[in-house]
Structures are given as structure tokens and as C-alpha cells.
Design a protein with these regions (language model features):
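Flexible, glycine-/basic-rich loop-and-beta segments that form/coincide
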Residues: 5-28, 391-514
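Conserved S-adenosyl-L-methionine
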Residues: 171-293, 298-299, 309, 355-358, ...
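Conserved Class I SAM-dependent methyltransferase catalytic core
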Residues: 323-388, 394-402
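A short glycine-rich beta-alpha junction/loop motif
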Residues: 400, 609-617, 649-675
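A short beta-sheet element
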Residues: 578-579, 588-636
Length: 706
């Protein structure tokens, strides 16, 4: 019989080859989120299937973290060893028993050296069985964890934590590429006192310290370490996060113990965390120059109204409909961290925070934007492409840099060197060096050849800003007095490249045509635009009237799905009468929850008796227009028109949303009806021929089915 292997490729432990690893052998870093996630997912599966000691998810996470601490410590010691050929501590021995003994001996020494990392110091061994310890060491020994320590620890935590009840806690750890650009943008220096009140595994703190250390000369490096001891703080509610973050800073030779366990928001619980008050207590309010954080976010992650009232969080005084209110309401944690940051910051202090984009445009969060306008000036908005967090969530986020407004006459800290008074810097750069699979994204040539250059246009924009050079994907815009009716927090809205391309096209290709927005045409009565009828629930779909969803609008056609049909009575309820109100040749496009928003589909004769989901727009030319629906469809189908939709389609949490921003789309308008018909004639002929063929097909089908 052949030797059996599990998914990780582990062979029976007595067959594992034994050899010494040195620091010279540490040459295999885990450079991508995907590789890290796969490694730890496979390790978790192996532990669940084979380990006899650790049966609880929390125990597995804790013990795996302890193994990672030992590995990282071994890597650090190896890099500092005088003899690069000196064997590393973290490697397999000839047998599982010997490997486990060695690891547990090293763990006991590690606990004695860093006792403040551990809440419970009574257990001085790794609670995996010998074979599991042997297998973990075997798989990790040849990998350089320290080269990507922040993301490695974050990924391990994410994978192991997702296996238990904490899966929905909204802890989406920040990828290193976001952290790097964010820390650069914050321009933190040794004058600043910094805190991350939701520090996770310490990515922002580690990058801040590392950045200052890299800029320091030999003599200054000791001063930077002293600065970190006195000015770099972190808080997290999860004890394992705190342990990992502290260990990360120790690995950077910071030695800082300023990362503490505690609840940053619920003040009534602060007495339960003895080390928290010196970091977050009332006497620390107004003492920090920088708050830098990626707080947990999610619609279900809220602080209760009673807790908000006790802490007097004014940001929690709002209605569920999106308006300010005197009463306190349950509020998402990520938003409440805004007020915690405001309290911690001195006048003119800087806040750098990752937040979902939906807070900055949805009508449900008007109260939030009004609160921000009263308390902060928005200095910068840094686009975070969807791919960055796609491995764990699909919410669209951005990194926001804000400055706490000072009271009149009070002293205030100076602006960052790149900031312009009264203006906000926005980058809508489309890439951040991470693809949709979590792998490193490389630039590809026009010929389709992948280069070795990382495609991180966000970092390029930040670098250009700091170097005072130009960028085609960023700009300064005037900061509005209020964010309530502004899209300042949505970077892509300020990408007007598609608008400029359209204007050039009209000038060079459509002589005599003018450019007008859909909103302007609608207001003038030249076109009509309405939403679809509504969305019948699944249990009502049992009739013979087609119900058209956004997924049924494809390739310019309205397609009827035979599995989505409703009865006539249901249809009339959604039509609000006996007629659908639709007419042949109407133009239909998705308006929500579709990647094809803006793509025109034409309603053919005979398709009028249908119920369209409310997530569609239905457009028609009126008698006032110098064009018909065929021209309207042709105009909407132009590439230079379709590209404009990407600017106005926002992400409502994790779904595409158009709102009324369709009104900003520009289309060409002919000077005469004849001119319009001449350019769109091929469009007219195409759809008329399809309609004729469809009518013949349906007639033949009907006769054969009698």
C-alpha cells in the first residue's frame, strides 16, 4: 500500500525527514493573502481532524497563536544570530515526542521572558498533541513568517476565528497594502501621540513604528524606540488579538506594553479592565494627536441605546430613517468609534479610519454625515478597491483622513504638509496591488504580458501627493460646508475621465449634436423615466405573467424566465390597474444589484404584459423629443455613454446602487430628427428584425402546441 497523505501533504510523522534549518534557509515568505489563508485553513482542517487534545475552537486559536509566536521569535533570533548557520529553534526533531518536548521547553522560556503577553500563566505548554505539534512545525519551519508578520498573524486569526461563533463579529483585518498607503498619508512623526482603539493584531501600530524606524539614522533609532514606549498605544476587546499585537511589537524590538485589553466604547465596563484607564480614561481625552484605526463594522454590530446614553454618545442620537434626534438609538460600532476618536484627539488632531462607503451617501445615514460635518474637516479620501477585502467581505470601504475641529480661539495642530485649506484630496485609483483572489496584482502590458511590477495605483497616488507631483487618478476638490447632500466620501464620483471622453467624442464624431443629461431631458419632458413595478415574493410566482428581474436583462434583450411567472391578479396589484403601463420599444436597464447597470435592453412588441422588478429603470422618448426610442437606445449603448455609469453606481454595503444619479449621465442629442435617425438606423433595423423573427417563431410554436 502507498503512504497516505492528508490535504497538507503530511506523511505519517515517523517518515518526516529530519534536517537542521538555519536563518539562511528562511527563504519562503507568504506574500499573498490567498497563500496565507490556504495555509492556515489547511492547518485548521488538519488539527480538527487529527488532534486529540484541542477540541474547542477557541483553544485551537489560542494554541495556534502560541505556535506562531514561537515561530516568529525563532525567525527574529535567527536573523540576529552572529552565525547565520546556527540552527533555528523552531524545527522538527527526529520524532514527534522530541519535537513537542523542544517546542514546549521553548514556550516555557518564552512565557517567562514575556509574561505580560499571557492572561493565564498557569499553563506552560502547547495544548496540542505531539503529532499535531510535529506537523505544524514541519509545515511552518521553512517559511519566513517575520517578513510578513502583521498580515500573517491577522490571517491566522481570521481563519481560526471564523471557525467558531465569532464569525459574524465584523473583524476584517486590514491588508498590508492598505496599511502602507494609510500610514504614509497620515504623516506621523515623533511629535505625535498615536492610538488605535480597535487595533486587532496591531497592523497600523507596527507599520507606524516601522516607518519611523526606517527614516531614523543609527543614533535616532533608540530615540524612536523611546518614542514608541511613550506615544504608541493600542486597545482591543479580544485577548488573543492583544497577545498577537504585543508579540508583533516585541518582534520589532519595540518592547512596548502599551497595547491593552479593553472595550473602547462601553465606558461602564472600563473598571473590568485594569490597564485600560491610563490609555482611554477621561484624563486621556484630548491627549492624542493621531487616531488610526479600522474598527469592526456591520449592520448587526451595534452599541445598544442604553450604553450609548450612559456614555453620552451624541453620534447615537438619530432616527432609523436617517435624521438627527434627541433620543438615543442602537448604532453601528464603526460609527461610534468616530466619537471615541473625537474625544481622544486634541484640537486639530488627525483621524485616519477605514469605513464603509455607504455611510457617506445613503439617505439612511444623513444624521452621520451631519455629525461629521459638525466635528471634523475631511482632509482626504483614499479609495480602497473592492478586491482588498474580498477574501472576507464584499463591503466597499475607503480610508478617510479627518481633522478634529478646534473650538474658537483654541490652539490647533498644523495641517499635514500635503493638505490644502478648504480642500479635500481624493484618490480614485482603481488598484491596490491585490486581485480578486487575494493574490498580488501585477501590471499587465497592452500585449497581455504580466510584468513583475505590482499594480498599486493607490500607493502611487499617495507617493505622488507627498512628492508634490501630478497624478491622473487623484485631485483636490472644494470641501463642502456640509456632507449631508454631498458625495465627498465616494472617491469614484470625482473620476470625470469618462465625462471628458464623452465630450471629446461628441466634438469629434457627432457634428451638430449637443450633450445633455438624462435629468435635464427628464425635467424638460423630452424623455420619461420610471422605476419598475415591484418585486413579488417567491411564493407568489405561480402564474403565466412574466416577472422580470435584473438578471433577465442581458445582451440588449429582455428575457422571460419561465420559472418566474405570476398570476394576473398579482400582476395587476403591482401594475396598480389592468395595464402594465409599458409600451413596445421601451428601454430598460438595471438600477440596483447588478454589474450591468446602465446597459440598455429593448422591450419588444408582445413583451408589454410583464411585471418588472422595482430595481429597473424604464425610459421612453416623448412626443417633445427630436428622436424616438431607437435613437435613445442607440445613444445609451455608445461606449462613451456606458462608461459614465461606473462613476455614479455606488456600493450600498455590498450591492450596486444607482439612486437618482442616473440623472447625471450625458447623451448626445441631434439637431434634427433626420440627423438622429441617420446615426441610429442600424439600431432600429436590428431590433425590428429581431421583433419580426420573434413574432414568426412564437406563431409557429403556438401552432405546433395546439
Amino acid at each position: 500500500m502507498g503512504v497516505e497523505h492528508d490535504k497538507l501533504g503530511f506523511r505519517p510523522c515517523f517518515l518526516i525527514q529530519f534536517f537542521y534549518h538555519t536563518s539562511n534557509d528562511e527563504a519562503r515568505p507568504l506574500h499573498t493573502n490567498l497563500r496565507r489563508a490556504r495555509l492556515f485553513s489547511d492547518l485548521l482542517n488538519h488539527i480538527v481532524a487529527n488532534d486529540s487534545k484541542s477540541t474547542r475552537a477557541d483553544d485551537r486559536l489560542d494554541n495556534m497563536c502560541n505556535m506562531l509566536l514561537l515561530k516568529m521569535d525563532s525567525d527574529t533570533n535567527g536573523k540576529m544570530a552572529q552565525d547565520p548557520k546556527e540552527p533555528l529553534d523552531f524545527q522538527v526533531c527526529p520524532t514527534p515526542v522530541e519535537t513537542a518536548k523542544r517546542i514546549n521547553t521553548n514556550f516555557e522560556r518564552y512565557m517567562a521572558k514575556y509574561p505580560f503577553l499571557f492572561e493565564d500563566t498557569s499553563t506552560k505548554t502547547i495544548k496540542f498533541d505531539d503529532e499535531t505539534i510535529h506537523a505544524i512545525v514541519y509545515w511552518l519551519q521553512g517559511i519566513n513568517l517575520k517578513s510578513a508578520a502583521p498580515e500573517t498573524l491577522s490571517t491566522a486569526f481570521q481563519v481560526f476565528r471564523s471557525a467558531n461563533v465569532k464569525q459574524g463579529e465584523g473583524q476584517y483585518f486590514t491588508p498590508q497594502r492598505i496599511i502602507e498607503s494609510a500610514v504614509k498619508l497620515m504623516e506621523i512623526d515623533y511629535h505625535d501621540k498615536v492610538i488605535d482603539p480597535a487595533c486587532g493584531t496591531g497592523g497600523f501600530l507596527f507599520e507606524t513604528y516601522s516607518t519611523l524606524l526606517k527614516r531614523a539614522s543609527g543614533e535616532q533609532r533608540d530615540e524612536i524606540r523611546t518614542w514608541a514606549h511613550r506615544n504608541l498605544y493600542g486597545v482591543d476587546l479580544d485577548s488573543i488579538n492583544v497577545k498577537l499585537a504585543r508579540a508583533l511589537m516585541i518582534g520589532a524590538r519595540d518592547g512596548s506594553t502599551n497595547i491593552v485589553l479593553g472595550d473602547s466604547l462601553r465606558e461602564q465596563k472600563w473598571q473590568d479592565f485594569p490597564m485600560l484607564t491610563p490609555v482611554l480614561g477621561c484624563e486621556t481625552d484630548g491627549s492624542y494627536d493621531v487616531v488610526l484605526t479600522n474598527p469592526p463594522f456591520g449592520e448587526r454590530l451595534k452599541i445598544r441605546a442604553t450604553d450609548a446614553k450612559q456614555a453620552k454618545y451624541s453620534i447615537c442620537q438619530h432616527t432609523s430613517g436617517g435624521y438627527p434626534n434627541d433620543k438615543y438609538s442602537d448604532t453601528e460600532l464603526g460609527l461610534v468609534f468616530m466619537e471615541r476618536a473625537y474625544r481622544l484627539l486634541a484640537g486639530g488632531g488627525r483621524l485616519g479610519i477605514v469605513l464603509p462607503e455607504t455611510y457617506f451617501f445613503s439617505s439612511s445615514y444623513q444624521w452621520f454625515r451631519k455629525w461629521v460635518s459638525r466635528h471634523f474637516d475631511v482632509l482626504a479620501v483614499m479609495n480602497i478597491p473592492m478586491e482588498a477585502f474580498q477574501g472576507f467581505c464584499r463591503a466597499k470601504t475607503n480610508f478617510y483622513v479627518m481633522r478634529k475641529k478646534s473650538t474658537k480661539g483654541a490652539a490647533s495642530m498644523k495641517l499635514p504638509s500635503w493638505a490644502q485649506p478648504g480642500k479635500t484630496w481624493i484618490t480614485y485609483a482603481p488598484t491596490i496591488g491585490i486581485n480578486k483572489d487575494g493574490k498580488t496584482l501585477y501590471r499587465v502590458t497592452k500585449e497581455g504580458t504580466r510584468t513583475r511590477e505590482v499594480d498599486d495605483t493607490v500607493l502611487s497616488d499617495v507617493t505622488a501627493l507627498l512628492e508634490r507631483s501630478n497624478s491622473s487618478t487623484s485631485c483636490f476638490v472644494a470641501t463642502p460646508e456640509s456632507l449631508v447632500n454631498s458625495y465627498l466620501g465616494v472617491p469614484q464620483y470625482y473620476d470625470r475621465i469618462s465625462v471628458k471622453e464623452f465630450e471629446r467624442y461628441v466634438q469629434t464624431h457627432l457634428q451638430g449634436f449637443t450633450a445633455r443629461t438624462l435629468g435635464d431631458l427628464e425635467d424638460a419632458g423630452i424623455i420619461s423615466i420610471r422605476n419598475g413595478h415591484g418585486s413579488p415574493s417567491a411564493d407568489l410566482r405561480n402564474g403565466d405573467i412574466p416577472y422580470v428581474k435584473v438578471s433577465d436583462l442581458r445582451a440588449g434583450m429582455v428575457n422571460f424566465n419561465p420559472t418566474n411567472m405570476v398570476s394576473l391578479s398579482v400582476a395587476e396589484r403591482f401594475w396598480r390597474g389592468s395595464d402594465s403601463g409599458l409600451s413596445p420599444w421601451s428601454i430598460v436597464t438595471p438600477s440596483r444589484a447588478s454589474k450591468n447597470i446602465g446597459e440598455p435592453s429593448m422591450l419588444l412588441p408582445g413583451q408589454e404584459r410583464a411585471v418588472f422588478t422595482k430595481e429597473t429603470l424604464i425610459m421612453n422618448a416623448t412626443a417633445e423629443a427630436l428622436f424616438d426610442n431607437f435613437y435613445l437606445g442607440w445613444a445609451l449603448d455608445l461606449d462613451v455613454v456606458r462608461k459614465q455609469w461606473g462613476r455614479v453606481v455606488f456600493m450600498q454595503t455590498n450591492r450596486e446602487d444607482l439612486g437618482n444619479r442616473y440623472r447625471e449621465i450625458l447623451i448626445p442629442i441631434p439637431d434634427t430628427r433626420e440627423h438622429g435617425e441617420s446615426v441610429s438606423n442600424h439600431y432600429r433595423q436590428y431590433y425590428r428584425s429581431i421583433a419580426q423573427s420573434r413574432a414568426k417563431f412564437l406563431k409557429a410554436r403556438e401552432s405546433q402546441n395546439r
